[in-house]
Each structure stands twice: as structure tokens, then as C-alpha cells.
């Protein structure tokens, strides 16, 4: 009996010591964790998110600081809301933060991350990014498609001329979706989506993929609520959309294999790389589909959102509109002719306008999440491996400590002599991200946006119908991964030719 009691006492003491050690270890670690709002059991801080998370996260950061730790259910989330904090994440420790979180949507829609944007950080991602940059997104390649951009911008201008002659309004939001879609479709597939059934179907599938990527699958953060994703059809949607996209791309690739066309589009280029056994990296047929998908997502969404917000802000700011019109119209020779990309290169105020729009309205207000691969210290805080990271670019680019008390105002003049570029060197301005995961298609998006705005503003005067905000379009944001306007931008063009 005494032996049993002794053994029980020893076991109890051992278990107590082990639990105490674990508790002390966890407590010591927690001492250096970033500030955190109080969280609820099971759901963590999910109740503190609004339909516009970039706004609610900014509000929390104003209270808890530019580096804070939240929990979305069981998942720790590091939220970065200042350029100084972003410096450590995107520069100092970039290689540790370069991975992507695994998600059901990415796994199902992107074949487990076989593209460039969502691929896990590693050799495959490095090789795929290299193939993309060296073969599809070089300056020479972007310049080679200038005629495509000119054709499509001119087609849009013709529609606006007709609206002007009949004094009717035009849905600019719709035009700004069609324009980059047609350009990307011709560049990537060799066909125009508005004139080709397969390309139209592909555009529809890409939009569905973006919508699914922007949804919030509660089951990934709170496993006991995974049944909700099933009931609302999220899992079935992923399977259906993925299958539809894959079938369409199989058809596109097969048509390219059978065609004898001297004009090489992106699919042709990738197929030639696939056939080249001496390229050093073997591109698989399946990989081609998802590289093209990246081109559509980046080439259409970023540009359409940028154009929509640019015209919104210019119409709201008559002084800025007049200043830009003066710059552009003094350049046009002969008056009213198409403004070419070479002419746009020297338009300083136009470039300042685009920079300011991207500051206030980055296409992705929160840079695509990253995943920490190993334990690290950030600004003196302990951050554990497996933590997901959200960089709130929208909050960083409206920081009054950096941009001044007028940070919320549209003021292109602040960029005329700023020296800022789009490559993420200054972490207070990161509309396309920074570091290893920076958007590789910057030149593709900007080239089309700049020449489009130049022709829209140079060749037309603009007005909107008076509404609740008078004669100014409102700034209400839609809900989604890419934050466009909630309501379409309807405006009246008046030709000045």
C-alpha cells in the first residue's frame, strides 16, 4: 500500500513539474508577444472584423499599435500597419516571411499552388517566377504588345465618342473591366474575349475564381464550424469552378498546339518552353494553365480597379482634372489624335495622379497573406513559426505620421518630387507589395492604365449626374479581395475634338 502511495506521489509530482515547466515556458514566451485585443473563446478576434477588414484592422492598430497579434479562430495573425514594421517583415526577414498560407480555395482552384502567386516558397516558385519574368514580363515583351493596347483603347474611345455625340452617359466601370480583359486575352491567348466565346467563358471563370479566393472559409480557422462552408456550397463551388476553368484551358492549349500562327502569345511562349528540354527547368502542361490564370487575375483586376478609382478621384477634384487636361492637351499633336505611350512617358502630372490613386486605393488593400516559416523577432517581439502575416498597405499609405494631416485627401502634387517608385523600396508606399513576393506584372498594369487615362482625360471633358453627393461620385467600396467601387461609375463624356 505504501509503495502504491509512493509511486502515485512520484507520478503526481512529476506531472506537476512538467505542467509547471510548460506553463512557465509559455508565460515567458508570451511576455514578448505583440499587443493583442481581448479575444473570445473559439472564434478569437473574428468578431472584430467588418465587411471591409482593411478598415477595421486599421482602427484596431490605432489602439494597439502598428504591430499587433490577432487570432482568427485557432490561427495566429500578425497584422502590420506601418512602414517601419513592414521594413522588418518585407526586408530584414523577407525570406522567413516569403511563404503562403495553405487554404482550401488555393488548393482546389490553383492545383495546390502550381502558379506563381500562390506557390509555396521554394525552388518550384523560384523557377516559375523566373520563367514568368524572363519570358512574359520583360520590358521588351511588354513593349511588343503596344499595338494591342492601342487597338483596344481606341475601340473604347470610339464607344465614348458615340456616347458624346448623343449626349448619353456611359458605364465606365463596365468599360474598365472590358478593356484590360480584352488586352490580356489577346496577349495571353491570341483572341479577344468580347468577340470569342471561349475567351468570354474564360473571363467568367476567372471572375468566379477571384470571388472564391476573396471569400472567408470559416472552417479553416474554426474547424468545428466547417459544416457552414459545406452548407453554403463553398466546397462544391470550388470543385465546379476549378473543373470548368481546367476544361476551358485544355481547349485553349489544344487549339494552340494545332494552330500554325506566326504571332506568339503567352500560351505559345509557354508551350515552346515546355518543349525545350534544355531550358534547365521543365514546365509542365498543367502549370501553363495556372500561369495564364495569374496573368488574367493580375492583368485585369489591378488595371480595372486603378482606372475606376482614377476617374472617380479626378471627377471629384476639378482642379486636378484641369491640371492634368492642360498637361495632356498641350502634348497632343494634332489636337484630338490618339496619345501614344511614348508621349505619356514625359507626363509628370499624369504619373503623379496614378501614384496618388494607388496610394489611396491599392488594388489589394491588404497584401496577399504570408506565412512565417521559422521563429523570428520583429521589433523586439517573439513571433512563432506558422503565424500568418497581413500587411495592411491601405493603412500604411494613409498613415498621417508619414503622409501628413491631409493623408486622406487626393493630392497628386505630393508625388511630383517624391522620388517614390513602385518597387517597394520605400515601405511607406507598397501598392504592389515588396520583397520576394512583389507583383511581377507592374509594368504591364501601369502601361495600359497610363495610356488609357491620358486618352480619356485628354480627349473628353467629364461630368456625372447630381446625386446624394452633389455632382461628385461617391467613394463607397465594394466587398472583395480587390476593392473596387460598390456602385458603377456612370459618367457623361463630352468630346473636345
From Swiss-Prot:
The keyword Nucleotide-binding does not apply. GO terms for molecular function: heme binding; indoleacetaldoxime dehydratase activity; iron ion binding; monooxygenase activity; oxidoreductase activity, acting on paired donors, with incorporation or reduction of molecular oxygen. It is an enzyme of class 4 (lyase). SUPFAM superfamilies: Cytochrome P450. PROSITE patterns: CYTOCHROME_P450. The chain crosses the membrane at residues 2-20. Heme binds at residue 439. Disulfide bonds: none annotated. Coiled coil: none annotated. Keywords: Iron, Lyase, Membrane, Metal-binding, Plant defense, Transmembrane, Transmembrane helix. It is found in: Membrane. It is a single-pass membrane protein. Its EC number is 4.8.1.3. Involved in the biosynthesis of the indole-derived phytoalexin camalexin. Catalyzes the conversion of indole-3-acetaldoxime to indole-3-acetonitrile. Required for resistance to A.brassicicola and B.cinerea. This is Indoleacetaldoxime dehydratase.
Amino acid at each position: 500500500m505504501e509503495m502504491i502511495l509512493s509511486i502515485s506521489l512520484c507520478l503526481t509530482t512529476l506531472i506537476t513539474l512538467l505542467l509547471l515547466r510548460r506553463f512557465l515556458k509559455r508565460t515567458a514566451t508570451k511576455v514578448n508577444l505583440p499587443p493583442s485585443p481581448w479575444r473570445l473563446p473559439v472564434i478569437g478576434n473574428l468578431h472584430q472584423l467588418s465587411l471591409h477588414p482593411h478598415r477595421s484592422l486599421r482602427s484596431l492598430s490605432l489602439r494597439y499599435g502598428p504591430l499587433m497579434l490577432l487570432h482568427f479562430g485557432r490561427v495566429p495573425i500578425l497584422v502590420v500597419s506601418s512602414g517601419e514594421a513592414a521594413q522588418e517583415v518585407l526586408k530584414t526577414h523577407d525570406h522567413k516571411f516569403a511563404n503562403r498560407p495553405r487554404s482550401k480555395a488555393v488548393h482546389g482552384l490553383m492545383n495546390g499552388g502550381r502558379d506563381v502567386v500562390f506557390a509555396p516558397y521554394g525552388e518550384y516558385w523560384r523557377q516559375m517566377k523566373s520563367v514568368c519574368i524572363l519570358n512574359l514580363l520583360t520590358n521588351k515583351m511588354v513593349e511588343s504588345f503596344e499595338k494591342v493596347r492601342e487597338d483596344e483603347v481606341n475601340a473604347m474611345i470610339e464607344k465614348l465618342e458615340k456616347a458624346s455625340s448623343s449626349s448619353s452617359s456611359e458605364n465606365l466601370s463596365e468599360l474598365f473591366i472590358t478593356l484590360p480583359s480584352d488586352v490580356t486575352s489577346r496577349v495571353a491567348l491570341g483572341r479577344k474575349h468580347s468577340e470569342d466565346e471561349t475567351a468570354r467563358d474564360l473571363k467568367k471563370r476567372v471572375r468566379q475564381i477571384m470571388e472564391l479566393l476573396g471569400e472567408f472559409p470559416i472552417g479553416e480557422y474554426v474547424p468545428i464550424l466547417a459544416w457552414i462552408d459545406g452548407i453554403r456550397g463553398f466546397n462544391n463551388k470550388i470543385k465546379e469552378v476549378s473543373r470548368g476553368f481546367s476544361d476551358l484551358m485544355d481547349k485553349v492549349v489544344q487549339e494552340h498546339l494545332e494552330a500554325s500562327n506566326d504571332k506568339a502569345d503567352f500560351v505559345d511562349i509557354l508551350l515552346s518552353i515546355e518543349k525545350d528540354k534544355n531550358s534547365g527547368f521543365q514546365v509542365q502542361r498543367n502549370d501553363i494553365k495556372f500561369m495564364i490564370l495569374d496573368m488574367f487575375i493580375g492583368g485585369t483586376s489591378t488595371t480595372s480597379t486603378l482606372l475606376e478609382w482614377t476617374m472617380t478621384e479626378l471627377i471629384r477634384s476639378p482642379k486636378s482634372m484641369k491640371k492634368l487636361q492642360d498637361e495632356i492637351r498641350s502634348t497632343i499633336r494634332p489636337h484630338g489624335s490618339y496619345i501614344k505611350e511614348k508621349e505619356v512617358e514625359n507626363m509628370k502630372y499624369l504619373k503623379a495622379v496614378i501614384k496618388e490613386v494607388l496610394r489611396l486605393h491599392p488594388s489589394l488593400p491588404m497584401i496577399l497573406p504570408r506565412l512565417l516559416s521559422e521563429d523570428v523577432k520583429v521589433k523586439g517581439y517573439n513571433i512563432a513559426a506558422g503565424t500568418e502575416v497581413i500587411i495592411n498597405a491601405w493603412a500604411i499609405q494613409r498613415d498621417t505620421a508619414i503622409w501628413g494631416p491631409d493623408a486622406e485627401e487626393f493630392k497628386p502634387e505630393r508625388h511630383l518630387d517624391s522620388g517614390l517608385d513602385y518597387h517597394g523600396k520605400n515601405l511607406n508606399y507598397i501598392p504592389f507589395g515588396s520583397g520576394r513576393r512583389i507583383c511581377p506584372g507592374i509594368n504591364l498594369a501601369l502601361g495600359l492604365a497610363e495610356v488609357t487615362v491620358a486618352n480619356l482625360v485628354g480627349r473628353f471633358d467629364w461630368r456625372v449626374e447630381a446625386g446624394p453627393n452633389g455632382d461628385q461620385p461617391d467613394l463607397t467600396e465594394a466587398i472583395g479581395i480587390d476593392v473596387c467601387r460598390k456602385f458603377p461609375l456612370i459618367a457623361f463624356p463630352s468630346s473636345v475634338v
